[in-house]
């Protein structure tokens, strides 16, 4: 009985200490954020470093530290931080995305693209890798690179249409409305029930110059090659 009581006390004390430690980390993180918002980046960085080293598995602490290094143009430190992390977890797509982003911000675009390709090469059959890396290219407005990555990812996907919406959005942003419409039509071929989604997404860009004409042309091309009732519905919507 006494042994059980002692064990309960020990477990309770350990749990309490752990809870206090977590609360302390949360408080420190909030303090660092306050410093950052106040423009005291050096003080914020010091706390972010402290937290990242105390909990090396915590991706939020790690990525926040990297972010503040980049915001201070401490690019070499960001690169070192990310490379060291890659050595520890070499299969993390996200790390290659972040490292490539640092190079891209430094105007070392070729090195950025090489780094993103290294990320994809971890597992070239993984659709997750293509989408993660493409997202970093998008964030950096490297649209052509993002398009290339997503199109390559389609080849390895059992359902290539999961890339169609991403591609359509990029095409629309770059005023390639015919290409955007073609991706939505591809989506509808495989998933006719998604016609309403296609309409909603198209409606976002149809006011763009030449968007209606290009979209109609794309839909008609699909009607000519594969007559499907949803395409007529879509065409009527665009008109």
Whereabouts are the PLM-identified features?
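Canonical tetratricopeptide repeat
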Residues: 30, 64, 98, 132, ...
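Canonical positions in the second alpha-helix
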Residues: 50-51, 84-85, 118-119, 152-153, ...
């Amino acid at each position: 009985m006494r042994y059980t009581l002692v064990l309960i006390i020990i477990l309770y004390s350990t749990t309490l200490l752990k809870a206090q430690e977590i609360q302390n980390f949360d408080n420190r993180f909030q303090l660092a954020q306050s410093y950052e918002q106040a423009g005291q980046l050096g003080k914020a960085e010091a706390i972010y470093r402290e937290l990242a080293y105390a909990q090396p598995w915590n991706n939020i602490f790690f990525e926040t530290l990297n972010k503040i290094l980049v915001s201070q143009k401490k690019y070499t430190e960001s690169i070192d931080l990310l490379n060291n992390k890659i050595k520890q977890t070499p299969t993390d797509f996200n790390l290659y995305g972040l490292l490539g982003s640092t190079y891209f911000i430094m105007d070392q675009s070729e090195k950025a693209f090489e780094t993103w390709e290294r990320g994809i090469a971890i597992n070239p059959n993984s659709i997750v890798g293509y989408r993660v890396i493409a997202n970093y290219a998008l964030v950096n407005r490297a649209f052509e690179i993002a398009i290339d990555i997503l199109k390559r990812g389609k080849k390895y996907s059992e359902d290539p249409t999961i890339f169609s919406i991403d591609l359509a959005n990029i095409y629309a942003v770059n005023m390639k409305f015919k290409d955007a419409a073609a991706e939505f039509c591809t989506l509808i071929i495989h998933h006719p029930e998604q016609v309403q989604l296609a309409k909603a997404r198209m409606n976002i860009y149809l006011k763009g110059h030449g968007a209606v004409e290009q979209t109609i042309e794309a839909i008609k091309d699909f009607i000519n090659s594969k007559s499907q009732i949803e395409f007529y519905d879509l065409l009527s919507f665009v008109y």
